Amino acid sequence: RRQELGKPDFDTFGMAAYIICRDTEEKVQAELQRITTMNPESKAYAGYKDFVGKSQLNVKVSKEDYCVSNRGLRPNLIGTPKQIAKRILAYEEVGLNLLILQFSPQLEEMKIFAEKVMPLVEQLRKEKVEAAK
């Protein structure tokens, strides 16, 4: 559509995503459950119900969407380091070149991502290039 209007393609195409990285799928699911569980008697749950009730969005806002800002769980960058690395590369293959990542607690989770996921992303990229030769 941009080309039809005589405009250049976007240089950057990105998305926001919340990362949950654990060594096992069981630990991933436990953390997901922890951050998306709301006590029905809590103010947070009341806020969610109020938001959903008053929302004029054309999409359903799930509890998971509400618990993590920017609907950060939708990109599904949760899993083991290898699962996340493969998903990142799959997004790259369709043109994504910017990730705005969310972590909590930020520093600790960023370290896990940097130490466990990023090296795998680089390794899998190299393997893909080698396989294409």
Each PLM stretch: what is its role?
Residues 36, 115-118:
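Short, electropositive alpha-helical surface patch
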Residues 1-93, 122-133:
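An alpha-helical appendage that flanks or caps ligand/catalytic pockets
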Residues 20-21, 77, 103-110:
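Acidic-and-aromatic substrate-binding clefts and catalytic sites of carbohydrate-active enzymes
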